[in-house]
Regions:
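Catalytic cores of secreted/periplasmic or lumenal enzymes
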Residues: 1-429
């Protein structure tokens, strides 16, 4: 009997070691405790720069804004959707690494203008002016990639997966392929039936923008300084052209001299690749104030001065594990190409994050992932919001939806299939 009692005591002791006791109105309630970390992996310590719990904030913000977005949205309606997208991007990336910066830039140009609604994919017709026609978007690429993947999805699950979801998931895979962090995404976005060409012309960031303009532009979309600086880390891949920074080499702010904030050694290196051109633009004038063209931009380079290409990864400096951090380290060395990039070191509230990301790879990857999640959820259309669901206009709504889907599937940029060359596309500036 004593043996049985002893066994019972031991059993209860073990049970209570993994469970707690709570008293609720006189009743004893057993509560399970969280199991100990048995992986042997030491939990990362908080960086001194991490003053707020960004993950908790994001999840709360996501709950308020995502509405009907949720994980595995297509689990029942198209269970292979995300696998098809992942497989497609990986195959294309293996053949053409330029797909990574192309898709990240395409995502930004879509989401930054009225939200992640695939409006940038819409072609023009008699009733619609396409965002593709806005000067900042003329050099966008990756439309054929989205079209190819969407077409495959249509053969498996016709009329189910939105173009907006295809784009955000494709961009996430592109980030991962380029050496960036993975980040979870909810799905269930709907597509827009309208485009916003004028807004794109007016509000997409310019390469010569001041830090005040940049921060204000991002702030109106809910991004603080930390998030804004982290998103700029994507400028560590892709290319840009001489015409969009040559004023910093030869005629900064109309002085006839180089930008004093540009490292002199780097300045001489750039001059060998971008020789002086009398047509070099000044900030805020001419086409130079628009978004830089990519390697196969839709804007003719005639009359634009130099059009040499500069690899923003500097031959993948430091390897893929330095995705992002090499960008911040170069800013600390005064080697930022774009005026807008180097401006991040001009204010204490942004410079502190440049320093932090230059020295802490894990902090950057975490913040970049969180900011990309937030960007991908910006002003999404969900449920009926992507359709005209008024009963009196139901037929019209269905017609427009069908028309939109066709446009999305056959989205063309006006560029040939060579638009995805082995060169890399510039990102959103």
């Amino acid at each position: 009997m004593r043996f049985l009692v002893a066994c019972l005591v031991i059993a209860l002791s073990v049970y209570f070691a993994f469970h707690g006791l709570e008293y609720d109105n006189g009743f004893i309630r057993f509560t399970k405790r969280s199991p100990a970390n048995r992986t042997g992996v030491k939990a990362p310590q908080k960086s001194p720069f991490e003053e707020d719990d960004l993950m908790t904030w994001y999840m709360e913000d996501s709950d308020r804004q995502s509405y009907s977005l949720h994980y595995d949205y297509y689990q029942d309606s198209c269970p292979t959707a995300e696998r098809i997208i992942t497989k497609g991007i990986r195959e294309i990336y293996d053949a053409k690494p330029s797909v990574a910066p192309s898709l990240i830039r395409l995502l930004f140009h879509d989401c930054f203008i009225e939200g992640c609604d695939a409006s940038v994919l819409l072609d023009a017709d008699e009733s619609l002016t396409s965002e593709k026609e806005a000067p900042p978007n003329l050099s966008l690429k990756g439309f054929d990639v989205i079209e190819s993947i969407k077409s495959e999805l249509e053969t498996v699950c016709p009329g189910v997966v939105s173009c907006a979801d295809v784009l955000v998931l494709a961009a996430r895979e592109a980030v991962l392929m380029a050496g960036g962090p993975f980040y979870p995404l909810e799905t269930g976005r709907k597509d827009s039936v309208v485009a916003f060409k004028e807004i794109a012309e007016r509000e997409l960031p310019k390469p010569q923008a001041s830090i005040s303009v940049i921060l204000a532009s991002f702030a109106t979309r809910g991004f603080n300084e930390r998030e804004t600086v982290s998103l700029f880390g994507a400028h560590s891949i892709g290319i840009t052209h001489c015409t969009f920074f040559e004023d910093r080499l030869y005629n900064f702010s109309g002085t006839g001299k180089p930008d004093p904030e540009l490292d002199t050694g780097f300045q001489q290196e750039l001059k060998t690749k971008c020789p002086f051109s009398a047509s070099a633009p000044s900030p805020g004038t001419g086409i130079g104030s628009s978004i830089p063209a990519s390697d196969y931009g839709g804007v003719s380079s005639a009359g634009r001065g130099n059009d040499g290409a500069i690899d923003l990864s500097y031959n993948n400096e430091g390897g893929e594990e330095n995705f992002g951090t090499r960008y911040y380290r170069r800013l600390m060395q005064k080697k930022g190409l774009m005026y807008a990039d180097q401006q991040l070191t001009g204010r204490e509230e942004t410079e502190m994050w440049v320093r932090a990301y230059a020295s802490d790879t894990q902090l950057f990857r975490r913040d970049f992932a969180m900011s990309m999640m937030k960007l991908s959820n910006y002003h999404v259309l969900t449920g009926p919001l992507g359709n005209l669901c008024d009963a009196a206009k139901l037929y019209l709504g269905l017609a427009i939806t069908s028309h939109r889907r066709l446009k999305c599937v056959n989205a063309k940029s006006g560029l040939s299939s060579t638009s995805l060359s082995n060169k890399k596309a510039f990102l959103w500036f």
